[in-house]
Curated annotation (Swiss-Prot):
Annotated region (Disordered), positions in chain: 25-44
Record keywords, A-Z: Amidation, Amphibian defense peptide, Antimicrobial, Cleavage on pair of basic residues, Secreted, Signal
Biological role stated in the UniProt entry: Has antimicrobial activity.
Modified residues annotated as Leucine amide in this record: 65
Gene source species: Pithecopus hypochondrialis
Expression tissues: Expressed by the skin glands.
Location within or outside the cell: Secreted
Gene transcribed to yield this protein: psn-9
Biased composition (Acidic residues): 30-41
This protein's name: Phylloseptin-H7
Length: 66
């Protein structure tokens, strides 16, 4: 009977450890995805902030060549 209790406790302990590891990996994956989304948004903002100067440069180039 004691052998069964020890085996059961061992199985439960190993199950909890593996569950904890899986949750940690899931959390890290979600953080990486959030970081990637934030990077994409910041790149988009940088591009959009440069857009007016690019347009004005293109307009002045057309005026010079036109």
């Amino acid at each position: 009977m004691a052998f069964l209790k020890k085996s059961l406790f061992l199985v439960l302990f190993l199950g909890l450890v593996s569950l904890s590891i899986c949750e940690e990996e899931k959390r890290e994956t979600e953080e990486e995805e959030n970081d990637q989304e934030e990077d994409d948004k910041s790149e988009e903002k940088r591009f959009l902030s440069l857009l007016p100067s690019l347009v004005s440069g293109a307009v002045s180039l057309v005026k010079i060549l036109g």
